[in-house]
Structure formats: structure tokens, C-alpha cells
């Protein structure tokens, strides 16, 4: 009789997170929170998202359908859940953290064309599933420091029963077979709905969801029961029996006051302890020092600050997920709660509209975006805030709108972006040289922007240099357009300072007004929100929230900002009260 195959106990463990009954149960936050707990126990954890859509990446998808595109350090356009992973694990991930059906099929078809399958009939099994497995197992490779992860948490997108998810679930099943059951863990998230007329929690949807998962060969090791209230022990015992799961693996996760409370909820239910026992992982007790400090800042703020986010996609808050999380983290830094005011950019085109929307806020954030819709409203919001000393932070497109507004204020009345008006006589924002083919339709749009981390050099004693406490920084980018250097001198007449550029001085990365002219009006071509962490707020957002708190505390009349006419004569704006 042949010897039984043995799997090394020191192998990287693989934990898969699946979902059933309905989508949007919080698989990503559940996996991120569990990853945070395992990290706090001294383990090396990395994460991955498997997305079952045919797009190669979300870069060309409508923000209303998909939410934000999260850009990694290496320039990959990924799912917003990757942002949750980075924020909860407090580590940078790469493009390999997001795998889509489009990537898998593109790779397999390319290999077939190269003849790598030696004449085989290319099929979903084994060729597609093998490609998926290779992406999953590659996450166990050592990082740049030679450290191999103890645990890889892989979230399988979609819902059990979806046709699109089947190849990913089959690949996950095969991974368990290859690495050994003792090195693999399946965590299934399911809905336990509350029926108000009968006053009952219903377990049948979870039973059917687990039955569907078992029908394709996967027996979950633990269940996350999502509900608006605690699931009582009697129902947990029933679910454990009917779904053949250890009672220790049946986890009640009622809605939490904050996403940052979820690790505490999972720890209270002892999920992390169950996982480390089941996978035979070395561990220590959870170190709550940093997370408890965060929760104190979340739940016991000393003051409140109101920030207006003037955007184009405000009907879906996920379109600005990293921005809102970075703003909240900036508030945590100051022991302050950030109240979001969602403002449709179209509402701010006229000064009266901007006044109605922004009169009682303490700061204005202009986020990124694409296309002409709502642009004049963003510019109108900047103009309103500039004339009243209201703190402003512009991101990517926000910087470009700040530059356009400054140019118009000194008489360049036709100032615009080549993106919004290709025929503008004054393209103060122009197409980057290496992006012209893509803009003209002569090259692919997907994956061709200026993506990923790029360095910038900051002017000493500038607002941004003081915020960063450095003159050399690196931020992530996602854009095709840049400030037109031919207009720099004329725009500078407005007082706008180009306080940060690429190392060669060519590309404008940061702009600001001197503090004597405006307390805080700063723009960056980058997306600093992508590097913010709840426990390590981004310095630019911390500085912005600090300026907003100062503005609120002063309760002053807005400062008089000199408006430059094209002939160089100053025109003072009439001061107006905040209210």
C-alpha cells in the first residue's frame, strides 16, 4: 500500500472567504478584519480578491456600477476591497491581489495561441482552473524581504450559485486538495434574515446556501452569520447541526457601529482562536494596543468637523470610498469626528448655489473623476471657498480644477482642460505626451494611464512640505492630463504656487496658495487617499482636517482675498458671513 501523502505543517495556510444568499454581505470587511486579528497575533498575512467579471480590471468600469478603482503601488487598477485589505492589514499589496475572469481567460487564450498547451483541447477544467490556482498559490511566495506569509486570505467574489463564480470555487476546492485539508480553511458568509411579522430569525437561506456550496465539493469550516441583531445560541446550534459545522465555527456578526468594530466582534465570537487552532498556527494573544486607541478616537471624538465632498458620483458613496476613509482617518488624528456633506458638483456652478451648499461647512474636498459633467460646479466650489478662506483639498482632477479657477481669476477667461474642451484656446491642462494615442482612440484605454507610485519633490517651507515633514515624497497616480507648463508663469500671477513637481521639474504634482493669501487651499495630482490607514492617517488629510478645525474654531468672517484682474489691478471680494 503506497504511503499517504504528507503536507508540510510549516506550509502557508490558505483561507477562502465565500458568500451566499445575497451579495454585499461584507466578505471583504470580514476577511480584512480576520486578517487584522491574525496580524495582531503576530502572523504574516496577505490577501487576494477573485472577481468573476470578464473585465480585465475595473479601470474602464462605470463608478456607479463598481465603485472606486483602487490603485496599488505597482500601478494595478483593482477592486475597492483591496483598499480594505491594505487599510486593515496596514501593508501595501500588489496587482496580484486582484484576479479577474478577464485576466484568467486572456492569459489562457494567449498561452493557447503560443502553443503552450501542446495541442490539448483547452477547457474550463483543467486549463482555466489551473490558471486560477497558479494565481492563488503564487500569493504564498516570499515578499521583497524574503518573508513568506503564514496565511493567505482569498475572497471569492460573487455569490455561491452564480455561474460566473463556479471556476473560482472549483479552483479553491482543488487548492484544498493540493495543499492538504489541514492547511486550508473555508469561511462562508451568509444572511440570517429577521422576519418582522413573525418576530423570527430564519436559518433556511443559510442551510440552502451551504447545501449549494457542498454540492460543488466544498464543506465550510466556519460560518459568518450576517444579521441586524445577535443570533441566539439555540439558532447557532441548529445551524451547526444542519450545516455540519463545529459550533465553535458558527459566528454571529450583527451590524456594528463602525467597520473598525468588526475585529472586536469576530474576536468576541472567538473566530481568530478557532482559525489558529484549526490550522495549527503559532500565535500569541491579540495585541489590542493600537486598535483600542483607534476605537477610542472613533467613538469618543472631542469635536466634530463638517466637510463637503463636491463630486460627480455622490449617489454611490463607494465611488469615493478611500477618500471618505482618509477623511475620517484625518479626523481620528485630531480626535475629531468628520461629518460628510455630499454635494453634487452641478449644484455649485453659480455662486448662489455654492453658497447654499457650502455656507455651513468647515472644509471642501474636490475628488478625482473623468469627463466634463459637473466640472464647472467643481470650479465654482473652489472659487467660492477661495474667496472666503474656506479650506480646500483637491485630488487629481481637483488640482486641475484649482489651476483652471486660478487661471480664470487672472484674466485667462478661456482657461480649460483639453479633456473637457479639446478646442479651448487656453488649455491650461493638457494631455500628457504619452497619453495622446489613447485619448485619440488609437490605443487601448484600459490600463494605459499614468498609474502607480511616482516620486515628487516639494518646495521647502511650503504647506505640503510642512504637512509631510519632508521634501521628497511618493504618491500613487491615475491620470492622463497634466498642468500645461506654458501657462505656469501667468497662473502664478494669481498667487497659486507650484509647490511640488516631479524630480525633473516637468510635471506639476502639488499646488497651493501661500498661507498669507489663503489658510489652506492645496491640490495634488496624486491620490494620497490610497495610502491612508486608520491607524496612520495620511499627513495631507491630517493637515486638511486640522485646517478645517482651525476654520471652525476661529468663527471668523471670511478673509478678503484679492482678486487679480487681467490688467493686474486688485479687486477685493466683498466679505460674507459663513451662514
Curated annotation (Swiss-Prot):
Residues 306-554 form the Glutamine amidotransferase type-1 domain. Pathway: Pyrimidine metabolism; CTP biosynthesis via de novo pathway; CTP from UDP: step 2/2. The active site is at 396 (nucleophile), 527, 529. It holds the Pfam family GATase. GO terms for biological process: 'de novo' CTP biosynthetic process; pyrimidine nucleobase biosynthetic process. Its EC number is 6.3.4.2. Allosterically activated by GTP, when glutamine is the substrate; GTP has no effect on the reaction when ammonia is the substrate. The allosteric effector GTP functions by stabilizing the protein conformation that binds the tetrahedral intermediate(s) formed during glutamine hydrolysis. Inhibited by the product CTP, via allosteric rather than competitive inhibition. ATP binds at residues 24-29, 81. GO terms for molecular function: ATP binding; CTP synthase activity; glutaminase activity; identical protein binding; metal ion binding. It comes from the Bacteria. Keywords: ATP-binding, Glutamine amidotransferase, Ligase, Magnesium, Metal-binding, Nucleotide-binding, Pyrimidine biosynthesis. GO terms for cellular component: cytosol. Mg(2+) binds at residues 81, 155. L-glutamine binds at residues 369, 397-400, 419, 480. InterPro entries: Class_I_gatase-like (IPR029062), CTP_synthase (IPR004468), CTP_synthase_N (IPR017456), GATASE (IPR017926), GATase1_CTP_Synthase (IPR033828), P-loop_NTPase (IPR027417). It catalyses: UTP + L-glutamine + ATP + H2O = CTP + L-glutamate + ADP + phosphate + 2 H(+); L-glutamine + H2O = L-glutamate + NH4(+); UTP + NH4(+) + ATP = CTP + ADP + phosphate + 2 H(+). CTPSs have evolved a hybrid strategy for distinguishing between UTP and CTP. The overlapping regions of the product feedback inhibitory and substrate sites recognize a common feature in both compounds, the triphosphate moiety. To differentiate isosteric substrate and product pyrimidine rings, an additional pocket far from the expected kinase/ligase catalytic site, specifically recognizes the cytosine and ribose portions of the product inhibitor. Catalyzes the ATP-dependent amination of UTP to CTP with either L-glutamine or ammonia as the source of nitrogen. Regulates intracellular CTP levels through interactions with the four ribonucleotide triphosphates. Homotetramer. This is CTP synthase. The gene is pyrG.
Amino acid at each position: 500500500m503506497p504511503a499517504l501523502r504528507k503536507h508540510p505543517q510549516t506550509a502557508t495556510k490558505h483561507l477562502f472567504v465565500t458568500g451566499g444568499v445575497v451579495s454585499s454581505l461584507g466578505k471583504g470587511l470580514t476577511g480584512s478584519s480576520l486578517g487584522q486579528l491574525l496580524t495582531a497575533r503576530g502572523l504574516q498575512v496577505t490577501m487576494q480578491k477573485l472577481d468573476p467579471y470578464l473585465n480585465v480590471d475595473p479601470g474602464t468600469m462605470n463608478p456607479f456600477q463598481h465603485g472606486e478603482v483602487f490603485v496599488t503601488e505597482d500601478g494595478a487598477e483593482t477592486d475597492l476591497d483591496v483598499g480594505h485589505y491594505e487599510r486593515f492589514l496596514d501593508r501595501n499589496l500588489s496587482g496580484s491581489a486582484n484576479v479577474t475572469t478577464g485576466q484568467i481567460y486572456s492569459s489562457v487564450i494567449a498561452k493557447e495561441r503560443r502553443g503552450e498547451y501542446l495541442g490539448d483541447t483547452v477547457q474550463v477544467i483543467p486549463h482555466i482552473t489551473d490558471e486560477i490556482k497558479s494565481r492563488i498559490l503564487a500569493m504564498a511566495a516570499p515578499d521583497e524581504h524574503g518573508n513568506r506569509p503564514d496565511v493567505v486570505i482569498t475572497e471569492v467574489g460573487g455569490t455561491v450559485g452564480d455561474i460566473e463564480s463556479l471556476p473560482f470555487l472549483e479552483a479553491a476546492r482543488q487548492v484544498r486538495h493540493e495543499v492538504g485539508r489541514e492547511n486550508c480553511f473555508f469561511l462562508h458568509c451568509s444572511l440570517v434574515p429577521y422576519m418582522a411579522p413573525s418576530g423570527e430569525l430564519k436559518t433556511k437561506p443559510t442551510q440552502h446556501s451551504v447545501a449549494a456550496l457542498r454540492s460543488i465539493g466544498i464543506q465550510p469550516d466556519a460560518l459568518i452569520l450576517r444579521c441586524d441583531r445577535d443570533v441566539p445560541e439555540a439558532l447557532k446550534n441548529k445551524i451547526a447541526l444542519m450545516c455540519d459545522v463545529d459550533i465553535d465555527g458558527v459566528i454571529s456578526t450583527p451590524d456594528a457601529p463602525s467597520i473598525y468594530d468588526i475585529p472586536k466582534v469576530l474576536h468576541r465570537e472567538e473566530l481568530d482562536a478557532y482559525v489558529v487552532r484549526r490550522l495549527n498556527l503559532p500565535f500569541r494573544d491579540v495585541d489590542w494596543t493600537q486598535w483600542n486607541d483607534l476605537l477610542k478616537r472613533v467613538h469618543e471624538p472631542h469635536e466634530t468637523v463638517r466637510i463637503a465632498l463636491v463630486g460627480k458620483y455622490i449617489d454611490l458613496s463607494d465611488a469615493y470610498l478611500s477618500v471618505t476613509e482618509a477623511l475620517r482617518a484625518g479626523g481620528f488624528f485630531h480626535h475629531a469626528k468628520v461629518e460628510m456633506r455630499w454635494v453634487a458638483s452641478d449644484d455649485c456652478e453659480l455662486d448662489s448655489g455654492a453658497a447654499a451648499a457650502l455656507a455651513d461647512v468647515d472644509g471642501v474636498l474636490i475628488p478625482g473623476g473623468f469627463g466634463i459633467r459637473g466640472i464647472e460646479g467643481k470650479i465654482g466650489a473652489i472659487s467660492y471657498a477661495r474667496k472666503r478662506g474656506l479650506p480646500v483639498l483637491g485630488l487629481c482632477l481637483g488640482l486641475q480644477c484649482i489651476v483652471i479657477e486660478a487661471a480664470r481669476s487672472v484674466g485667462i477667461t478661456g482657461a480649460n482642460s483639453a479633456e473637457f474642451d479639446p478646442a479651448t484656446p487656453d488649455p491650461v491642462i493638457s494631455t500628457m505626451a504619452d497619453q495622446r494615442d489613447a485619448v485619440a482612440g488609437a490605443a487601448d484605454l484600459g490600463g494605459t494611464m499614468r498609474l502607480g507610485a511616482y516620486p515628487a519633490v516639494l518646495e521647502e517651507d511650503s504647506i505640503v512640505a510642512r504637512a509631510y515633514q519632508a521634501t521628497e515624497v511618493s504618491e500613487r497616480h491615475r491620470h492622463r492630463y497634466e498642468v500645461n507648463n506654458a501657462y505656469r508663469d501667468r497662473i502664478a500671477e494669481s498667487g497659486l504656487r507650484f509647490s511640488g513637481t516631479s524630480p525633473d521639474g516637468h510635471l506639476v504634482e502639488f499646488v497651493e496658495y501661500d498661507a498669507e493669501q489663503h489658510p489652506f487651499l492645496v491640490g495634488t495630482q496624486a491620490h494620497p487617499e490610497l495610502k491612508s490607514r486608520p491607524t496612520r492617517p495620511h499627513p495631507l488629510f491630517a493637515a486638511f482636517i486640522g485646517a478645517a478645525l482651525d476654520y471652525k474654531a476661529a468663527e471668523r468672517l471670511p478673509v478678503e482675498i484679492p482678486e487679480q484682474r487681467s490688467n493686474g489691478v486688485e479687486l477685493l471680494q466683498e466679505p460674507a458671513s459663513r451662514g
